[in-house]
Amino acid sequence: MPKLYEGHLIGQGLRFGIVIGRFNEFITNKLLSGALDALNRHGVADQDIEVAWVPGAFEIPMVARKMASAMKYDAVICLGAVIRGATPHFDYVAGEVAKGVARIGLESGVPTIFGVITADSIEQAIERAGAKAGNKGWDAAVTAIEMANLMKILK
């Protein structure tokens, strides 16, 4: 039988950094609420959570890299909302943010979680921020807890 590794969902004693984009704040506030609720319900103390607001999604990777390189967080959670408009701006921003967040996790070894909603409409973003389709902030926080614990096991 192979040896299996899996991160558990107990957040007590873990530290988290959250980077959140202010653009589309009516959506990102809901993501932050979901993430904080998930962290607290899984045993993470408020004093073990630090939140950094950035102007928009494009700035998330820069601050996430700073947090990951500080090596004081067990995981960094990236939250934002990019909503498609009439120009190709959406494609550039969404793609670069996703690549940046992934690169930071790979280079730093600190789980860096992509909790950025990419939506075709405001309605779709609202659904993913706590209405019909769950809350992607909550999902990102639970993923961060699991990955932080898995990385501790694999050290």
From Swiss-Prot:
GO terms for molecular function: 6,7-dimethyl-8-ribityllumazine synthase activity. (2S)-2-hydroxy-3-oxobutyl phosphate binds at residues 86-87, 128. The active site is at residue 89. Its EC number is 2.5.1.78. It catalyses: (2S)-2-hydroxy-3-oxobutyl phosphate + 5-amino-6-(D-ribitylamino)uracil = 6,7-dimethyl-8-(1-D-ribityl)lumazine + phosphate + 2 H2O + H(+). One of its GO terms (biological process) is riboflavin biosynthetic process. It comes from the Bacteria. It is an enzyme of class 2 (transferase). 5-amino-6-(D-ribitylamino)uracil binds at residues 23, 57-59, 81-83, 114. Keywords: Riboflavin biosynthesis, Transferase. SUPFAM superfamilies: Lumazine synthase. Catalyzes the formation of 6,7-dimethyl-8-ribityllumazine by condensation of 5-amino-6-(D-ribitylamino)uracil with 3,4-dihydroxy-2-butanone 4-phosphate. This is the penultimate step in the biosynthesis of riboflavin. Belongs to the DMRL synthase family. This is 6,7-dimethyl-8-ribityllumazine synthase. It comes from Pelotomaculum thermopropionicum (strain DSM 13744 / JCM 10971 / SI). The lineage of its organism: Bacteria, Bacillati, Bacillota, Clostridia, Eubacteriales.
